[in-house]
Amino acid sequence: MFQVQCLESAQKAATENVAKFCIEPLSKGQGITIGNALRRTLLSNIPGTAIVGTRISGVDHEFSVIPGVKEDALEILLNLKQLVFKGNLNEPIITRLNIQGPCIVTAGDIDIPTDLELIDPQQYIATITDFSHLEMEFILEQGESYVLSEKTASNNPRGFLAVDAVFTPIKKVNFFVETSSSKERLEKERLIIEIETNGSILPLEALNLAAERLSSLFKLVNSADLTAEFPTEVENIVQVSQTDVTGVLIEELELSVRAYNCLKRAQIHTLGELLKYSKENLLEFKNFGQKSANEVCENLHERFNLTLN
């Protein structure tokens, strides 16, 4: 019977929620397929709220020194990247901070609307060393993934410094595949997926949302009016050079579960990392036998016309 179980769950800190899930039973080959799709969706397509720009009174550029403040503008921008917000925004909003020293300035000093929540109000921003005032404004937006300040700067009003926007609430995703046997003596797989979030969303909520995103995408593909035109002549096959595939994930080799898990445990995630090893090097990995080494070499040659050193 198909099931999704939560094997472990813990909150290590205000901005660190971790959980491990098991998805089973799966047919042979489905573990890597589903695991890879969920991992990419979790890291790239789960929305979150972040600061995209800030205005600091008396500051013209990010390298400015702020009178009476221990940190310069650049250090404050880096600290703002660490702030975690929970809540949905339909459009960008501006929030403010106005405080007099001497004091330590934290996230809780920011005046935010009631429908937004700061996950860690004690998150450090700056230190005012004398009786100076620190006045700041922040632009908050909702988005996905990670957007560099070079891209957020174009949408900010004049006088605002751009901030690298860490929208994604997902800090880390890992998965591996195990084999199991069913009552019908068929080889089955179970997918173990580990998710770590920043506290603005629970790992289970993130997993459900990623599954919904993928389900919606596949429904669109299934409902589309698909047509295809086939060429009358077979086009020449262009050989892929080694430099073209260095970033290709090892999932594209479609290896057995044993060979795949051994490579992942050895921190080999791309073909570029794999090509640094020889066949003899692979045999030195734990539980990596001659059969697995032969499989890696054969699939590497068949799919990409590449060989190990």
From Swiss-Prot:
Reactions performed catalytically: RNA(n) + a ribonucleoside 5'-triphosphate = RNA(n+1) + diphosphate
What UniProt keywords are attached to this protein's entry? Chloroplast, DNA-directed RNA polymerase, Nucleotidyltransferase, Plastid, Transcription, Transferase
Q: What domain of life does the native source organism fall in?
A: Eukaryota
Q: Where is this region: Alpha C-terminal domain (alpha-CTD)?
A: 237-309
Q: Where is this region: Alpha N-terminal domain (alpha-NTD)?
A: 1-225
InterPro entries from the entry? DNA-dir_RNA_pol_insert, DNA-dir_RNA_pol_RpoA/D/Rpb3, DNA-dir_RpoA, RBP11-like, RNAP_asu_C, RNApol_insert_sf
Q: What is its main location?
A: plastid
Q: Which GO terms describe its molecular function?
A: DNA binding; DNA-directed RNA polymerase activity; protein dimerization activity
* Gene Ontology BP annotations: DNA-templated transcription
Q: Offer a single GO CC term for the protein.
A: chloroplast
Cellular localisation: Plastid, Chloroplast
Give the matching CDD domains. Answer: RNAP_alpha_NTD
Q: What is its EC number?
A: 2.7.7.6
Function description = DNA-dependent RNA polymerase catalyzes the transcription of DNA into RNA using the four ribonucleoside triphosphates as substrates.
- HAMAP family in alphabetical order: RNApol_bact_RpoA (MF_00059)
> Quaternary arrangement and interactors, per the entry?
In plastids the minimal PEP RNA polymerase catalytic core is composed of four subunits: alpha, beta, beta', and beta''. When a (nuclear-encoded) sigma factor is associated with the core the holoenzyme is formed, which can initiate transcription.
Regarding protein family, the annotation reads:
Belongs to the RNA polymerase alpha chain family.
Q: Any domain commentary?
A: The N-terminal domain is essential for RNAP assembly and basal transcription, whereas the C-terminal domain is involved in interaction with transcriptional regulators and with upstream promoter elements.
What is the official name of this protein in its record?
A: DNA-directed RNA polymerase subunit alpha
Tell me what organism the protein belongs to.
Emiliania huxleyi
Q: What is the lineage of its organism?
A: Eukaryota, Haptista, Haptophyta, Prymnesiophyceae, Isochrysidales
Q: Which gene encodes it?
A: rpoA
